Amino acid sequence: MKNIATVILFLLTFSNVVMAEYSQGSILKNSLSYQATITRDIWGVPHVYGKRDEDAAFGLAFAHADDDIKNIAENMYLYRAQMGLKEGFKGAVTDYLIKALKIHSLIDENYHSSLSEDVREVLEGYVAGLNYWNEINVNHNYKSLFPITVRDVLTGFVIQNLYFSGVVTEIEKLQDGRYQQKSDQNSLQTRFYDGYKNILGSNAIAVSSFKTDDESTRLVINSHQPLDGPVAWYEAHIKSDEGWNMMGGTFPGSPFIFVGFNENIGWGLTVNKPDLTDVYELEINSTNENQYLLDEKWIPFKESLVRLPVKILGPIKWTFKRQFRESVHG
């Protein structure tokens, strides 16, 4: 028997403006209504139902926040490029990368043009669920990180791709001096093969019903994720009357199931370390360090200023300013 506890959630939420300034009062005061039902099985796993996809996303956010607000909320330091306020100078290095890559402006510029209306509605419903949870839970340690915005959630997707695609690893190699300034063909081949030594990755195993004694289909997903942090799995089942039906794992701050199954298919997720990053070695003008050689011409770098708020000691904070330079390659 399942020990079922049902929660019906209603929300009057904010307008559909992705980067709107939210206030605590406006979250409950303005705009649209969401409704979701959350039931829990004997393992505590939430089964979320909504008539619309965005209703179901709203309920998923509420359930996830109820179970693991720590990992969801602490992700906001990373997604907002505020790790310096949490970890001091060490965290500011990550903030610099996020700002130098202009992730936030990329999201702002492409939100409506790159994402369908259906996807935007799911994202906005999910964010509404997180903020509604915050409104009715007054005693938690993460009030200062609310409200959460759609931009925050989308930044999480971009950052996850940076890690899984190997971009961060390549940057760390550059910082550690693991790339030689001048390379012959032999050293390039050596680096290529060294990069593929001792690869440990995730795996998924599917067994057909024709191969099992009880004629059951089995799916084993072993994705090698940590038990805590921004990429820790959270199990849930989400279903709507519009056809959404998935059960499996998602990350803190994500409205979508990443690994799992439905009535027709099952799927896993693995990071197989493909080579997705190019590193360009630029020749700098010896008489002008702000220029690099491109097509036999000296081209000026594009320069920008980033501001990095950093925790110095206790409540003492300081905003540091740093220049970064871009070539046509990025």
Language model regions located:
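Compositionally biased, intrinsically disordered low-complexity regions
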Residues: 12-15, 154, 305
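Substrate-recognition/specificity elements adjacent to catalytic centers across diverse enzyme folds
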Residues: 21-230, 241-243, 247-250, 254-256, ...
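Sec/Tat signal peptide C-region and signal peptidase I cleavage site
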Residues: 16-20
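Glycine-rich, phosphate-binding/catalytic loops in enzymes
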Residues: 236-237
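Sec-dependent N-terminal signal peptides
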Residues: 4-14
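Compact, glycine/acidic-enriched structural inserts
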Residues: 242-246, 250-316
